[in-house]
Amino acid sequence: MTSKTTIVIGYVPTPVGEAALEAGLEEAKAHGDDVVLLNSPRRRSTVDGEFIDEATADELVARAAAVGVTARVDQSDHGDDIVETFTKVAAATSARLVVIGLRRRSPVGKLVTGSDAQRLLLDLDVPILAVKPPR
């Protein structure tokens, strides 16, 4: 019998984060993976709008359980570099996949992307599933 593998899902409480969550849970359910929901605040800022509280974390774990997926929330402090945090969490969990959400951008925005998503796509040594929320 093979051991379970892990998917790391980057989660923020936005439509982009929800798209990543849904895609990641689908993938985990299909392949029998565990999930780590990475919700990493900047330098432990508890006023960060992307930082989820304990009740929301519990709700996300329950949503995963409802579809048969074991999940936990990781709120590792990422300081100034979220890519490094993803790298560390992916390595620590031996992740087979990372799922991130992407914002829709204008044509000009696509040309001048200096985004964390682009850096993740270029720098992370784990397969990445990047999804957009529905229009």
Specify the residue positions occupied by each region the protein language model found.
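Short, flexible loop segments at boundaries between secondary-structure elements
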Residues: 126-135
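Glycine-rich, Arg-bearing micro-motifs that act as flexible, cationic patches
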Residues: 100-123
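Small/aliphatic-rich secondary-structure junction motif
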Residues: 2-54, 67-69
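A structural preference for short, hydrophobic beta-strand core positions in alpha/beta folds
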Residues: 37, 73-75, 130
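Conserved acidic residues
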Residues: 5, 96, 125
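Short secondary-structure boundary segments
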Residues: 39, 97, 101-103, 132-133
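Structural beta-alpha unit
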Residues: 1-2, 66-98, 104, 118
